[in-house]
Amino acid sequence: MLALERSLLRGFLSAAESQEWKQGEISATESGSVLQLIFDGKYEAIFSNSTIRNVFSASSVAEEDIESYLEKQILMYLDCSTEVDNMERQRLMFLLGVGSLQLFVQSNWTGPPVHLQLQGFLPSALLQKCLEPKMLHATILKMLVLDAESVYTLTSHPILLLIARVVLVNSRHKLSSLQTLPWWTLRCVNIHQQLLEERSPELFTLAQMCIRQMTEAEALFAGDEGWHLAVQFNLECAYTFLYYYEYKKAKQCFCTAKDIAKLQINLTGALGKRTRFQEKYVAQLILDVQRSEEFIPPHSELTPAPTPLENLTMNCDLNDDTVLNEIKLADADQYQVPDLCAEELAVILGICIDFQKNNPIHKLTEEELLAFTSCLLSQPKFWAIQTSALLLRTKLEKGSTRRMERAMKQTQALADQFEDVNTSVSERMKIFYCCQVPPHWAIQRQLASLLFELGCTSSALQIYEELEMWEDAVICYERAGQHGKAEEILRRELEKKETPVLYCLLGDVLKDHQCYDKAWELSRHRSARAQRSKGLLHLRNREFRECVECFERSVQINPMQLGVWFSLGCAYIALEGYEGAAKAFQRCVTLEPDNAEAWNNLSTAYIRLKQKIKAFRTLQEALKCNYEHWQIWENYLLTSTDVGEFSEAIKAYHRLMDLREKYKDTQVLAILVRAVVDGMADRTGEAASGLKGKLRELLGRVTSRVTNDGEIWRLYARLYGNGHSDSSEDIEKSLQCLTKAHKCEIQSNDWEKDVSSFKEVAKGAIEIAHVAIKCSKKKSNNQEALQILSSARLNLRGLSSKAKQRFVDVGSHEICNEVTDEVTTMDNLIAELQELSNQLRDQG
């Protein structure tokens, strides 16, 4: 049976397997006929099978809900006496679960639409409890609610997922003979999660257990025959981890899949043209894909055969009068991508999605992702990969004026393909679970979003209302300034049926706590959304204590709400509850390790808690996520300086100057200069004096941008020894810096009037004179030495005469006592400088 289970996971039988299957015993059984229907993509026909109909039929229906009834009937069928019969029954129920899941995927993801009547296989007595179809639909949806997270209301044929869940989740303890059951349970979990408003901790726990169980099933992946499934399993695990914020585990799985596939995937540059009128070839970013060690995927018959091009979604041309449809390379043969199989293409798509999740939104990132999509679209072979690549490209192109029209057309084509009956579901299901194709309503939602951005508000609203995506419709109305209309449609829907979500949306529109309280009561105190929305309103009104209470209740119900943890942390900081803030932001970065702002805020909490080393480390993580955020760099600069990471502080200062041309922090520079000059120990115990060269380079850059700050010039002079160095170059540099500092200080008019300010200026001039004397003595050229002495003398003479004019006692006509010492020192230095000048002239 393991061989057939492998084939079922792949979705098809190879020619050899098909021959073997026809000759085997299982093909003649009930489970064999159902398995054949699944291979043929005739999932609806499963529900016409007499045995399966008998499982669902009962002479009497007790007072129970549909889920309980289904579970009871399936377990009754499985609880039989003979071992041989039991194996067959396990197989049949397992295939019922798989077939139901596949049909549910067809009904909501791939198309074409499914026309299944519940009356055909469920007893009428069970269905009569719900008087009308809408009521029955709502009842089934309610059974799929997990962790109080609502299910998308227009989910098509939810009974199919319910059956799949009853078999693959609730009854899995009775299906012990099926080795691949955990993998199908994982697929069921991933599909179920995509219907829910938020991530479900219950589903994630189940997914982790399934992954663990399948990882231990070594026989399934052994040898060349297991190669295809090993790649697929790692990709499916990666997408699961990615969705639940487990980015490191996701990356490991993507890398494992790439290593098994023996692919080398690198972004590189190649000469090419992008526009029709471009004359010269210039460097273009492309994806270079090669197989390592001339590897050829084993057993080509075990990989899906490519779908005919006419059955794939059309790749719309750009039709621009300037930009080419694709890059025209100067040497296309040099970067020829090998003919890739389904698993290899899925690996490239996975690496692309991982790259997207782990890099900040930036123009360069967009170009890199477009290189991935171009590579994938150059080999159109599989519906799921083509759809995923085209969807990603439309998201990347919607911001470009030259590409917006194609993005619009392409999204429309992707939305329309669901109704297309020309491509069989078997073709669409190839490699489906390795690609994370969104459900068809998510594609329509993307189309509506594009329409709204283009200004087609009424068309966007029409789609949102047809999809019953009331939150998007409300946002649309609010942005269009039609607040009354937003309230009107919500009240209209509430008249039809009161739900916690609708009351939450009404609360958002009216900014009314009563609406959230009503939602909370309706949900029987299980709606994380109600408490989240109520908390956000308190936050907006700066009612931080009440806001914290609401957010705490919300994350207690569903701890996988990234945004709520972040807002909770902000509220705690406002209340100066730094321990609570640290805990909240720690949960944020655990859920999303590349959330730069959360890392930054976590460091703020640690600083307030006097845990500076932790703050330093968290800021390092923040910068890995966002290298362009100047406020994070500033926090990093201050924290690095504070903890003695002087080398990092210098690096941070340079980066801040990259981001903000005239950035200045004199206090930090003063600490760094003192650390280097005094040889202070850094955090590792090393003397900071070793950073003298790097700090001189930094101050050189700072003074080239900020030329009018005397204090910075003085720090620069101090770094060169303030004239006390043995090096003539250092003494001269000190003199230059001190002179520039002095010029900055005398640019202000106030220093001449105020005694203390004058004394500071005089002190600076005296220091310049002393350094000038030292510098002149180091000069071999007498003319240069004379110039230095003359400049210092003239400066002192000007200050001395100013003092004698401004700071004179009216009665005695003598200089004020407060400046007597400075004037005497200056006069003595003037005489000394004159004497030295005379000596130099005599030597000349």
Curated annotation (Swiss-Prot):
Q: Give yes or no: UniProt keyword Ligase.
A: no
Keywords, sorted A to Z: Repeat, TPR repeat
Regarding protein family, the annotation reads:
Belongs to the TTC27 family.
Annotated TPR repeats reside at 454-487, 493-526, 528-561, 562-595, 597-629, 630-663
The protein here is known as Tetratricopeptide repeat protein 27
Q: Which domain of life is it from?
A: Eukaryota
